[in-house]
Design a protein with these regions (language model features):
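AAA+ P-loop NTPase catalytic core and its hallmark functional loops
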Residues: 2-142
Length: 144
């Protein structure tokens, strides 16, 4: 049996996400569920076009969220950097939920995470048996 500590952002705030997406008639980047403006409203709070109250998920500098969303709307990556406890994981989960509809494929790192750990891992039984080979390589989520 698998137990979840808590439901995902897209499950907890499904009504808010649906209300924002339904009333969102602005241009959306390719593969986005809603416009950048609606994503900012989802994260910072406000009202959906139908009057649904959108709870703030982040209380802080509005420009930080606007810049993060604008960066994601381009072809650039976004790296949230800061001391522990500053809501980086929380914000990234909500951005993923609003943009793609799923926050299940987040990649979380620490200061000690190597770039290669993000890209792939090794099946050590195969590595010992056959040496470094494609069969021993285990691709990470970014390749799925």
């Amino acid at each position: 049996m698998t137990a979840m500590l808590r439901s995902s952002a897209e499950e907890i705030f499904a009504d808010e996400l649906a209300a924002l997406a339904k009333g969102d008639d602005r241009e959306r980047p390719a593969n986005w569920k809603m416009s950048p403006q609606a994503v900012v409203t989802y994260v910072l709070g406000g009202r959906a076009p139908d009057g649904t109250v959108i709870q703030p998920k982040y209380v802080g500098n509005r420009r930080l969220i606007e810049t993060a969303v604008a960066t994601l709307a381009t072809d650039r990556a976004l790296l949230l950097l800061g001391v522990p406890g500053t809501a980086k994981s929380w914000v990234s989960e909500h951005l993923a939920a609003a943009i793609s509809g799923s926050s299940r494929r987040l990649i979380q790192c620490t200061a000690g995470t190597d770039e290669n750990q993000i890209r792939y891992g090794w099946n050590y039984a195969q590595l010992l048996a056959k040496g470094p080979s494609r069969e021993a390589l285990v691709l990470s989520l970014i390749h799925i």
